[in-house]
Amino acid sequence: MQDVLNHLSRQLRSFTLALCLGLTLLLTACGDSVSMLTGDYVEDTVAVVHTLQTTLALPADAEGLQDSEREAHDLINDYMSRYRPQPRVNGLSSFTTMQTALNSLQGHYNTYTNRPVPDDLRARVDKELGKAEKAVLRGT
């Protein structure tokens, strides 16, 4: 009798644990991620440019650099997934310039996760971000 109760107790604990883990995964996967994007292309582009320029300006030994780079990585994903499929936006010169800068930076973050952004890449991306910001403010 005791063996049967122990077996049932073990099964109940396993089932409860599996249920809790499943619900946790379901709720976190379906939750709306907090994003700084507003849906306004001009505002979002300027905000992303400023955020990325701030992240790029951090020294290699800055406290919180990895967190900033991780947030930049997520921001790039959010921005591109929002605006790449929109034909009214992705034909603009500001978007293509922005896309070039973001692809370069994202490529570095994906390939060299724990390494600082090289100076030449930093300068090129910063220049392209500046061009994209000027173009979007002009309306092109």
What kind of feature is each model-predicted range?
Residues 37-91:
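Alpha-helical segments in soluble extracytoplasmic regions
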Residues 26-29:
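C-terminal motif of bacterial Sec signal peptides marking the signal peptidase cleavage site
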Residues 66-73, 92-100, 119-130:
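Short, charged, amphipathic alpha-helical segments
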Residues 82-116:
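Long, amphipathic, charge-rich alpha-helical segments that form helical bundles/coiled-coils
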Residues 31-34:
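Bacterial signal peptide processing site
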Residues 3-19:
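Bacterial N-terminal signal peptides that target proteins for export
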Residues 49-51, 55-58, 110-140:
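C-terminal amphipathic alpha-helix
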